[in-house]
């Protein structure tokens, strides 16, 4: 083992972020290294660790992380030790790899990879990381695969980073592939139409491995998945067509009490329950029972440590954050916020919003709730769009569409934006709601303000 210290660990992590392209410091286009050759070699160097446990592979535009975490929580309830690999992280990159041990009390929460393990892994393979010219995501993928094997997990639920066909996670051969909802995002890398993006996601479908498709895919998108499944001789299940065995008796119960809040989780829940049906058929030894499974899914956030999805940060005033950042995700989120005002759940709405410069703001501006007070902000990443630019484009859009932009402000950093939102809520009185979102980076910088 290499000599470990907290100081050495922090220095090494900082150097890894600088040496290898990641979306924390460069654009997706710069960070994304398509192709599986590097990962195949790295995986072999690590001893093909993913072959030592069974896997579920998840791709999709939105809902991957929630689906992965619910599924892992349900599998752990069968008495299994389950790894979860998701991205991005919010506060600590070790959040990307977690283990839920169903043989322990659920109150213990998940285990994160230790700093010592990360340090030893990175120092041990330091020369290989440079030789193979890996991306940051490829490094963390290898780290997760190896850690799961060393910790002797029974199953691991693996989420793709971007796309599917050429994603570094696509070296695994899973028991089940899952594709969540499809939307327009990262079009410069994945394609400009839903069909093109679906084709990239369909790349995770392996020969003879069943696939569950979630969301409500348009016919042209469903056709892409059916065609690929046919080529791979894989059984395909559309979650919105079948009636999952636990849906009728347990879906309402789960949704009412689930700690992963947000109306969009109902669609993810249906995908998870359909996936559990398929897994139960493949592996009858899995004890997927009604109430036990329902309660495990209901407490997904606590059991798996999954955060940033319609998460309440404060109750005085109410503050909700969500990392949804593309038009498809924000359509759902903003509709739910409008619903709160329509039914008088809240008397006013204040939105702290920041966005990355590579997002198509023209597709998002029409979705903005018109009764909100807006506080535009700039998170600390070179990828961010400046708050002043968001404000200027919002003003222009409002002028062209007969809306007022008077209730909109600019804060150059997230902490100041949160402070202004709280002051504004106090001035409004009544029962205000603060929503923080638009980007993972905004949420990650806002969360410490409430801890």
Give each language-model segment a name.
Residues 1-60, 67-69, 73-78:
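Short functional linear segments
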Residues 8, 30-36, 41-52, 77-172:
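ATP-dependent carboxylate-amine ligase catalytic core
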Residues 71-80, 148, 394, 398:
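Hydrophobic alpha-helical packing residues
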Residues 88, 92, 143-189, 222-257:
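Extended acidic/charged loop-beta regions that coordinate divalent cations
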Residues 150, 155-160, 167-178, 182-186, ...:
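Nucleotide phosphate-binding/pyrophosphate-handling subdomain across enzymes
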Residues 198-206:
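Membrane-proximal helix-turn-helix segments that form the acceptor-binding/catalytic region
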Residues 216-237, 246, 318-320, 327, ...:
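C-terminal helical cap/extension that packs against the catalytic core
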Residues 439:
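Active-site-proximal loop/hinge segments that shape catalytic or ion-binding/gating pockets
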